[in-house]
């Protein structure tokens, strides 16, 4: 995946918009993440197609809830006509989105907040994605050991985002349906790769008979992949993660990881902006749009449709 870093206005956008253009900012959770770079490119492309301004905004960490609230408030004050946002926190962004929606239509993508005032919610069905990932993990455990039995663990990127909660919920639903599978730990991170690595190393050390790890986000997969490399446990532990990056693709190709659940981040950004444009022009939007999820394995990673999702062309210039 060739990531081209977009020029981002990260924090303060008040007064930054052109006087007469329609302006629909896209506010993501972490402007430095490869996943969110793809979302921003999708939004940028929609803006180019519609002939509108699409400022590409966001804090530099998913843990910076206050920073995202500031970006949202400044975007409204700066003259946005509608807003697209992925909420860093279900609880923390509820009231700010309620307030923003008093002035402009708000389309939420990826992760919802505790608000009923958004025009639409466009995201992966994350519960189903969690089911998909953990079902694949359990299936491979059964294939390897002759039965769906053994110890498994979950590595959570961090508390707060609804998308991560939903993925864990879906995973737990699958695990609960197998009496022989024991969930020995759920590690809750702090939105850093270092913590994800340390959590995975701790799991591997603490549970020598561990047979599976499910990561609910890209950086968890990076941490687990590195941990499996360092400990030489890639053949013993079935690891599946959400999202993709160049390194995660390499981990699939060399067998370190056994599955990726990939989303459509470009589509989220693109559909989000187009939906927000329709909403500002008085059109009713569906309450929920499932943007889809796909299981990627060593068996299908070379397929043309999978390759197109893993390596989107990020050509938009804001």
Residue ranges of predicted features:
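Hydrophobic alpha-helical segments within soluble ligand-binding/sensing domains
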Residues: 68, 122-149, 195-197, 244-248, ...
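Short, solvent-exposed amphipathic alpha-helices that sit
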Residues: 35-50, 129-136, 162-181, 199, ...
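Flexible loop/hinge segments that line or gate small-molecule binding clefts
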Residues: 90-128, 132, 144-147, 151, ...
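Extracytoplasmic "Venus flytrap"
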Residues: 23-42, 46-50, 55-69, 80, ...
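Hinge/cleft segment of the Venus flytrap/periplasmic-binding protein
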Residues: 151, 155-159, 163, 174, ...
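Hydrophobic alpha-helical
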Residues: 76, 81-102, 171, 185, ...
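Bacterial N-terminal signal peptides
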Residues: 7-16
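Short beta-strand elements in bilobed, periplasmic/extracellular small-molecule ligand-binding domains
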Residues: 48-61, 151-156, 172-190
């Amino acid at each position: 995946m060739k990531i081209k870093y977009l020029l981002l206005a990260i924090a303060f956008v008040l007064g930054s918009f052109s006087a007469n253009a329609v302006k629909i900012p896209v506010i993501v959770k972490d402007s430095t993440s490869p996943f969110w770079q793809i979302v921003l490119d999708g939004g940028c492309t929609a803006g180019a197609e519609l002939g509108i301004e699409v400022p590409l905004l966001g804090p530099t960490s998913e843990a910076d809830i206050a920073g995202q609230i500031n970006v949202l408030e400044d975007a409204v004050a700066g003259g946005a006509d509608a807003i697209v946002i992925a909420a860093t926190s279900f609880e923390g962004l509820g009231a700010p989105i309620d307030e923003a929606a008093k002035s402009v239509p708000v389309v939420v993508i990826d992760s919802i907040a505790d608000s009923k005032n958004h025009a639409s919610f466009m995201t992966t069905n994350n519960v189903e994605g969690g089911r998909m990932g953990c079902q694949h993990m359990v299936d491979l455990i059964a294939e390897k050991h002759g039965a769906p039995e053994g110890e498994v663990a979950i590595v959570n990127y961090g508390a707060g985002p609804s998308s991560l909660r939903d993925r864990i919920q879906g995973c737990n639903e699958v695990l609960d349906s197998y009496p022989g599978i024991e969930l020995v730990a759920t590690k809750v991170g702090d939105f850093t790769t270092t913590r994800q690595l340390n959590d995975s190393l701790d799991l591997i050390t603490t549970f020598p008979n561990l047979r599976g790890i499910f990561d609910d986000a890209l950086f968890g997969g990076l941490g687990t992949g590195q941990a499996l490399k360092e400990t030489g446990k890639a053949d013993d532990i079935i690891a599946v993660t959400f999202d993709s990056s160049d390194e995660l693709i390499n981990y699939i190709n060399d067998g370190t990881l056994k599955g990726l659940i990939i989303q459509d981040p470009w589509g989220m950004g693109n559909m989000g902006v187009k939906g927000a444009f329709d909403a500002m022009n008085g059109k009713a939007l569906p309450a929920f749009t499932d943007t889809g999820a796909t299981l990627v394995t060593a068996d299908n990673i070379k397929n043309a449709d999978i390759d197109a999702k893993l390596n989107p062309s990020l050509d938009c210039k804001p």
